[in-house]
Amino acid sequence: MLRQDAAPERARVIGLLDAFQAAERAGAEAVGRWIAACSDPRLRGGLRVIRARDARHAALAEARLRALGGEPAARPSRELAALCGVVADPGVSDRSKLALLLGRLPAREDTALDELAREAEGDAETHALLETITDDERASVRWLRHMHEALEREGT
């Protein structure tokens, strides 16, 4: 829990959580639309898990920000909204969507979410929440890379 004299820190953590919940919610919605247009049953199955994780991450972040006295108000960035639009577009191939998503990620394990967790170190509960969510995100990225490689090998 945050120290009682940590109002500025609380506000900062609420802002981090708010931005994160908005991004995860937008991602879950876009992946849901991708699932509807996806023709590969393997990809569809994995995307269902990713969508469920993203929706749960959004709910967890929102619950934490509310516990800290905040209200969700953030919207996804323009860049994220544009990416979600491509992911949700039935006219874009699954391979292209995977390539676009994976191309935005660093090759190393350290991610923007790791940085977000570090930024929340002053709040032990939020920090632990974000560290655990980071593990989920890494699993999703590993699976997306595996699927991209499989689709590339198959030429589909």
Regions found by a protein language model. Give the residues of each.
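Short alpha-helical hairpin
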Residues: 1-7, 29, 79-81, 85
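Amphipathic alpha-helices that form helix-helix packing interfaces
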Residues: 27, 57, 64, 105, ...
